[in-house]
Amino acid sequence: MWEEPCISGTRGSGAVFFSGCGLRCVFCQNERISQKGEGKQVTPKRLSEIFRELEEQGAHNINLVTAAHFVPAVLDALALYRPNLPIVYNSSGYESVETLRMLDGAVDIYLPDYKYIDPNMAAMLSGARDYPDVAHAAIAEMVRQTGAPVYDENGMMMRGTLIRHLVLPGLTGDSIRILERICDDFPGIPVSLMGQYTPCGRALTMPGMDRKIRKKEYARVLAYMEAVGLDGYRQELGAADGAFIP
């Protein structure tokens, strides 16, 4: 799986996708997995074997994608086999602190989204009016567990939290407010500023959400990120692979 350079490196991240999601994003690109339950059932033993196989294939880390509702099974699998690799918890940010505390000591890297700061937008676009407060509390817990980011000699993240934010069309003001809050509340935590929003699914029928973001929209948010000195990654708009640049 391709992620930010400090996660994907040269050999890729060993992604394990879990069916289902607590959000109902109108622009979700993985609806078959997140909302329609596509996937196959595996036991904790088989999951532990998948971890081993990804390790043997050379993955830089084990990347657990939307695993919140399978945390007990994930912990059982890690008890059976703990790879000698960082464990990445790849999250929408819509997580309970109680669930995250179960992962304390098991997860090395948290990769949460920080999608919304406006409850009305969170309700309209993801069906979760409480997302801003829930995500902020969740990220605070993630940062508490991991502390400041730690990298190896090749720039690979070995421990830490990397916050992702996707700029949405017409909502640059909200994006700037999110970056401001990250700067104030999570100093030293890197941010991945994403610009690859692609209208799909229900978003195609929603005025304002039925287009990609404009370069000037992304540029405005990026300029703020640079002005306040937030460390992290930006995305090259229009690049075939949506490449991230440190």
Q: For each of these PLM feature ranges, what is it?
A:
Residues G147-P246:
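Auxiliary Fe-S-binding modules of radical SAM enzymes
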